[in-house]
Amino acid sequence: SSTPSLPRLMINRNPEDDDGNRLPIGSFSIYHNDAGENIYGKPIKFRPFISAMQYMEYSAEEEAYLSRSIIFKNWKDEPIDTVGGVRCGKVPFKDRANLSADELADQRSKKCYRLVYGEVTFTGKTASGADYEVKDYPVLWRVTGTQFNPVGNALKSISQRKKLMFNCLLTLETEKKKAGANVFY
């Protein structure tokens, strides 16, 4: 049996699903348990509750995570991982000068994710195009890469204004960007 998990808020990067339905690239998507399928839409309203971080090492060959750190809230915390190390072996940028090319390549599979738990509300569509209303639906928004700092800065600005995260409703939108052949949102 599978363990129930919190649906993830993601940005859709697939042009179509397994049934050939066209999907809106760059839209947010969640798996909605009541609908039994993914719902796509943007912009969305997001109410954050908790923000934390976690290191994970992913193997493309095994299509699985090889290790995960504890979930931590502060950079001063020591993120011990599931294989007995720290940060899943991720070496801080300032310490990478002496790494070999292979060691640097290995670092790409190890990432720090910002985990933001909250609720989403939006008017979306199913893959087949049916309208679907999502209201105050609990999700995990896991961000890394170019999203990591902007999301962190937005959440930090809430606390700097002496507001509680769960009293704030953020409007989230995506923006298409390109770097060479890579397209990201």
What is each PLM-predicted segment?
Residues 1-132, 179-183:
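OB-fold ssDNA-binding interfaces and closely related basic DNA-contact patches used
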Residues 112-184:
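Extended serine/threonine-enriched, polar tracts that run as long, contiguous segments within proteins
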